[in-house]
Swiss-Prot record:
Cofactor note: Binds 1 zinc ion per subunit.
The encoding gene: cobB
Stretches assigned to the Deacetylase sirtuin-type domain: 3-253
Described purpose of this protein according to its UniProt entry: NAD-dependent protein deacetylase which modulates the activities of several enzymes which are inactive in their acetylated form.
Cofactor: Zn(2+)
Provenance organism: Rhodopseudomonas palustris (strain ATCC BAA-98 / CGA009)
One Pfam match: SIR2
GO molecular function: histone deacetylase activity, NAD-dependent; NAD+ binding; zinc ion binding
Chief localization: cytoplasm
Name this polypeptide is given: NAD-dependent protein deacetylase
Gene3D superfamilies: 2.20.28.200, TPP-binding domain (3.40.50.1220)
InterPro entries: DHS-like_NAD/FAD-binding_dom, NAD-dep_sirtuin_deacylases, Sirtuin, Sirtuin_class_U, Ssirtuin_cat_dom
Catalytic activity: N(6)-acetyl-L-lysyl-[protein] + NAD(+) + H2O = 2''-O-acetyl-ADP-D-ribose + nicotinamide + L-lysyl-[protein]
Binding site for nicotinamide: F40, I108, D109
Length: 253
């Protein structure tokens, strides 16, 4: 059902939240645009100007690794200045109230943690851009160290433990999805009674399968997104309005 108006959608969503005992939010890029982080897939977004660097190219070529880190540091101020928007804060309020056991996100910006979610309760399907990992041994490297290395040498860094390449702790095209995050997201979708997909076009698989899984397992499904999605027809409620305006009334409540 598509909400006929914003107020109607908010009222229906509030009623569904009140009657739910285990709510699992699933967030995409749309929730962070209010924080100043662009949706990379949108027209004019980063990927319309620069093709993503596939994982196998990153592994094989020094110039690809250098370019990947150049792009990351070109976005430095965007990520550094970003603060949780109304959508993030509303979900954090529901989490603190005990309604939300954990959150599933496609985002890499760390804003759910900043908004108040414990790190272990944020299931990051596509990783996190605020630190780096060795692609060999998995050792974590902080961005301050990477930045110093990159601007001193002009090249992407190598791990201090095993000398393999270091990349942002994000999932690149062609890179395997994190198995622990996929397992946890599956469990959350299977056992919630309300699944809310927020700011996602629901076209990137396998992540887009979680709303369908939740619905198949008996949960109510809400989709909050300005544009239509292919899963609108199976949703119990579709709200095609601004995320901040839709979730804003739930901040602190």
């Amino acid at each position: 059902m598509i909400a006929p108006s914003l107020s109607s959608g908010v009222e229906q969503l509030g009623d569904m939240i009140a009657h739910a005992s285990s709510i699992v939010p699933f967030t995409g890029a749309g929730i962070s645009t209010e924080s100043g982080i662009p949706d990379f897939r949108s027209p004019g977004g980063l990927w319309s100007r620069n093709q993503p660097i596939p994982f196998d190219e990153f592994v094989a070529r020094q110039d690809a690794r250098d370019e990947a880190w150049r792009r990351r540091f070109a976005m430095e101020q965007t990520f550094a200045k970003a603060r949780p928007a109304r959508g993030h804060r509303a979900l954090a309020s529901l989490y603190k109230a005990g309604k939300v056991p954990a959150i599933i996100t496609q985002n890499i910006d760390n804003l759910h943690q900043v908004s108040g979610f414990a790190e272990h309760d944020v299931v990051e399907l596509h990783g996190n851009t605020t630190y780096a990992r060795c692609i060999g041994c998995g050792k974590r490297h902080e961005l301050d160290w990477v930045r110093e290395w990159f601007f001193r040498t002009g090249h992407a860094p190598h791990c201090t433990a095993c000398d393999e390449p270091v990349k942002t702790a994000t999932v690149s095209f062609g890179q395997s999805m994190p198995s622990d995050a996929m397992r946890r997201a599956t469990e959350l979708a299977q056992h919630c009674d309300l699944f809310i997909a927020i700011g996602s076009s629901l076209v990137v698989w396998p992540a887009a399968g979680f709303p369908m899984l939740a619905k198949e397992c008996g949960a109510k499904l809400v989709i909050i997104n300005r544009e239509p999605t292919e899963q609108d027809e199976i949703a119990d409620l579709v709200i095609r309005h601004d995320i901040g305006e839709t979730l804003g009334p739930f901040v602190g409540n």
